[in-house]
Amino acid sequence: MVVCGETMKLVSLGVMLIGTILSVSSEELVGVWLGLELNLYGFLVIMNPDGHYSPEPCVKYFVVQSTGSILMLVGFVSLMEQHVVSGLVMSTAXTVLKSGVFPLHSWVPSVIKNSSWLASGLMLTWQKVAPLVFLSMILPSKSLWVVIVSMAGIGAVGGLNQNSVRVMSAYSSFVHTSWMLLGLTWSSVVFVGYFAVYSLSVGLFFYGCSLMNKMSMGSQLSSAASGMGLLMLMGMPPFLGFLAKVLVFLMSGSPVIVACIMGSVISLKFYIDFFYSMVMKSLVDKNKVEVKAIWSLVICMNIMGGALILVSFI
């Protein structure tokens, strides 16, 4: 059963990969829709491959994505029939819903909260690629700026005082989505660079958190993985998350970059709260403090703080 489950995961990941590539590279609207559907069905298997998790997030995700698919299909048919206005409205609404961006974003935290670590990680990373790319193509620049500013604000404020790591990560993804959308407005290379760094950060963070739930695994590995991923998500120098933001900042000439920066600064609050409440506690094993690990962490934080000060002067 375990081998069968792992095989199903690999097959589903392959289907998701093919679907995303088809959707992004297709020049026809039908190809975009078909790619998104392949991606959806592949991901549904990942969400609950062996039936051990609650079916609620899987059902909710299916309903949301199916609604988006129907709206998108109706919009595409309307565009083919030369009903441009209604077609664009339906297509945009469906893409916004499937992307989980403002104003149809409220379903994301509730689905993430009860999903597995793997499903949550993929939902916050890979599942965003095709819808965001298509959204950047059909939305006018000013409308896209409204989405970017709204996502940065909602993610920063919504993540405050959250007790669930997954929910916190969902709101954090809203802030990072604003950065990715801003990068998409200028260059696909910038988007790919930021997305790669963000995906690596989420992968490390969720991997460390999943290890914390397994008593057979040591605390040092989980602390190192989650701590490294968290620092990258925070955008602290000299980690890659900081460099990715600098790349978008240098390439973007839009004033909405201010909203993205403010969203990232505010989101530091709940990142730091999690850092001290979980990562520092994981360094204590049966009331025995691992002094070397703590001192290494303190030294690392001081070095990064000094680097941040130097960067601010530069």
Swiss-Prot record:
This is NADH-ubiquinone oxidoreductase chain 2. Pfam families: Proton_antipo_M. It comes from the Eukaryota. The chain crosses the membrane at residues 13-35, 61-80, 85-107, 117-139, 144-166, 189-209, 224-244, 246-266, 294-314. GO terms for molecular function: NADH dehydrogenase (ubiquinone) activity. Core subunit of the mitochondrial membrane respiratory chain NADH dehydrogenase (Complex I) that is believed to belong to the minimal assembly required for catalysis. Complex I functions in the transfer of electrons from NADH to the respiratory chain. The immediate electron acceptor for the enzyme is believed to be ubiquinone. It comes from Mytilus edulis. GO terms for cellular component: mitochondrial inner membrane. It catalyses: a ubiquinone + NADH + 5 H(+)(in) = a ubiquinol + NAD(+) + 4 H(+)(out). PANTHER family: NADH-UBIQUINONE OXIDOREDUCTASE CHAIN 2 (PTHR46552:SF1). The keyword Oxidoreductase does not apply.
